[in-house]
């Protein structure tokens, strides 16, 4: 289904250029998957279309900084490079995406994986941010459960988390 034009590594990240037909398929998949996954993804994940992006994250941080005494900021090292394909595909299956989208994601993950590691995803790919959002959804759900009982607030942009706490 998808075909690569070329691939390269830069600063530890794997990048690819898809053939034009594949680029079109990925643009269409981004729209389709975005619609299918909209209700599945956490509202605290702001890089997803319609969730406010970086500006919403900055506004959130400014408001919370005035209300909470402590803040923790972290990002996940080698985020895209360390994603387990089987875990991601299971999450997509659980989210109920259609078979066409599922098969396209399988291609998207496997083609650049020349060493057959079963891990990693291209950085900067058109559907990588959306798939990354899916991959961290279990962590988002866990954080959402902690918010009321521990009086914490959190927000995520890609793999960057902000957690605010009173003590």
Predicted segments, located by residue:
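Short, ordered beta-strand-loop transition motifs
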Residues: 8-11, 159
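Conserved pre-motif C helix in the palm subdomain of viral-like polymerases
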Residues: 11-42, 117-145
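A structured, charge-rich N-terminal accessory region that forms the first stable segment of a protein
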Residues: 1-8
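Conserved polymerase palm-domain catalytic core
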Residues: 58-167
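Active-site-proximal segment of RNA-dependent polymerases
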Residues: 26-84
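Charged, low-complexity surface segments at secondary-structure and domain boundaries
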Residues: 14, 43-48, 87-93
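Generic detector of ordered secondary-structure context
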Residues: 20-21, 25, 53, 97, ...
């Amino acid at each position: 289904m998808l075909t690569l034009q070329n691939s390269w590594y830069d600063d530890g990240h794997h990048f690819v250029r898809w053939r034009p037909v594949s680029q079109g398929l990925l643009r269409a998949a981004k729209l389709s998957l975005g619609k299918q996954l909209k209700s599945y993804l956490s509202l605290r994940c702001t890089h997803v279309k319609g969730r406010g992006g970086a500006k919403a994250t900055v506004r959130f941080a400014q408001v919370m900084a005035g209300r909470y005494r402590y803040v923790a900021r972290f990002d996940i090292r080698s985020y895209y490079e360390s994603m387990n394909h089987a875990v991601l595909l299971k999450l997509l299956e659980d989210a109920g995406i259609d078979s066409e989208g599922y098969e396209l994601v399988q291609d998207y993950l496997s083609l650049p994986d020349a060493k057959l590691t079963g891990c990693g995803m291209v950085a900067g790919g058109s559907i990588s941010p959306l798939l990354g959002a899916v991959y961290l959804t279990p962590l988002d759900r866990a954080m959402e459960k902690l918010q009321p009982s521990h009086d914490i607030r959190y927000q995520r942009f890609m793999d960057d988390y902000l957690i605010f706490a009173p003590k």
